[in-house]
Amino acid sequence: MSEIKTDDPKRGIKLRGADKTARIPIKVVPLQEKLKKPEWIRAKLPSRKFFEIKDILREQKMHTVCEEASCPNIGECFSKGTATFMIMGDICTRRCPFCDVGHGRPNMLDPDEPKNLAESVKAMNLRYVVITSVDRDDLRDGGAQHFADCIKAIRETSPNTKIEILVPDFRGRLDIALKILAETPPDVMNHNLETHPSLYRKARPGANYQHSLDLLKRYKEMMPHIPTKSGIMVGLGETDEDVREIMRDMRAHNIEMITIGQYLQPSDGHLPVLRYVTPEQFKIFEKEAYELGFTNAAIGAMVRSSYHADEQAAEALRESHGGCGHH
């Protein structure tokens, strides 16, 4: 799927932190005094396996969102031999001020990326792979065909590997994107709501809460056997009741799996953390999620969208009568 713009001198320049968020509608104002990080926010130290995987990734010229988004669980996940791959480059066309991925005009798609990704998955011997991407508003299908090409390539070389895709919102391109991803389905379809709709102007400029809900609802209607999943962060200014409202909205749109984790500010140029949710409150959210009918809820301070995704999916795939029919 070809890009809309070609020979652009600004293509490939990546802005991060304050440079990235300088032109969003609501300015990022640092707190006068940062909230102290509580003792329950702890990441595990990396093992030797972590460095082995890093070597494989550099060899294959692959980007993982684990590295690009400065994920706190990178040591633990790499050490278990799992990784979330970010396709279509590491430059995003959006400027969300909670996110540590760079903004700019992305490079052309790499036609070898699906093959390289499949080789990485095979070399790392992954049982479960998560594929995500930057937003590509410069592509006519938002990058859906590239996702499909990556799924096909992995299915060919690692037929027993389960594949979860964590997709952008395909704004303005949803019909074509859903059609493409229904023709080449993953094992789990994930798209994050990120936060409460009242905070979208501040945290997700350019996105729409109802559009994101509709994306997952429509995909579920097209592909009833594929589990759907979404996630949010807490600490951006939402209340506990806001979190409950999001959970109810997810269930009303047939979303089956949920992740909720603590937002951690990547740099002073990003949105500040306005609260640290306690482990006790995360437990309450988890209990309420199961009461609402989610098949799986990964909820806790250090949870990120793909954290323990393999364990989450095993549960959901059992619920969806033993898988999706392509293995």
UniProtKB/Swiss-Prot annotation:
GO molecular function: 4 iron, 4 sulfur cluster binding; lipoate synthase activity; metal ion binding
Catalytic reactions on record: [[Fe-S] cluster scaffold protein carrying a second [4Fe-4S](2+) cluster] + N(6)-octanoyl-L-lysyl-[protein] + 2 oxidized [2Fe-2S]-[ferredoxin] + 2 S-adenosyl-L-methionine + 4 H(+) = [[Fe-S] cluster scaffold protein] + N(6)-[(R)-dihydrolipoyl]-L-lysyl-[protein] + 4 Fe(3+) + 2 hydrogen sulfide + 2 5'-deoxyadenosine + 2 L-methionine + 2 reduced [2Fe-2S]-[ferredoxin]
Radical SAM core domain mapped to chain residues: 78-295
Binding site for [4Fe-4S] cluster 2: 92, 96, 99
Transmembrane annotation, as ranges: none
Residues binding [4Fe-4S] cluster 1, per UniProt: 66, 71, 77, 306
InterPro entries in UniProt: Aldolase_TIM (IPR013785), Elp3/MiaA/NifB-like_rSAM (IPR006638), LIAS_N (IPR031691), Lipoyl_synth (IPR003698), rSAM (IPR007197)
Pathway: Protein modification; protein lipoylation via endogenous pathway; protein N(6)-(lipoyl)lysine from octanoyl-[acyl-carrier-protein]: step 2/2
One Gene Ontology term, aspect cellular component: cytoplasm
Keyword flag Transport: no
Co-factor(s): [4Fe-4S] cluster
EC main group: transferase
EC number, as in UniProt: 2.8.1.8
Residues in coiled coil: none
Record's keyword annotation contains Mitochondrion: no
Localization (cell): Cytoplasm
Keyword vocabulary terms for this entry: 4Fe-4S, Cytoplasm, Iron, Iron-sulfur, Metal-binding, S-adenosyl-L-methionine, Transferase
Pfam families recorded: LIAS_N, Radical_SAM
Manner of cofactor binding, per the entry note: Binds 2 [4Fe-4S] clusters per subunit. One cluster is coordinated with 3 cysteines and an exchangeable S-adenosyl-L-methionine.
Family of the protein in this entry: Belongs to the radical SAM superfamily. Lipoyl synthase family.
Protein name per Swiss-Prot or TrEMBL: Lipoyl synthase
Lineage, opening ranks: Bacteria, Pseudomonadati, Pseudomonadota, Betaproteobacteria, Neisseriales
Gene coding for it: lipA
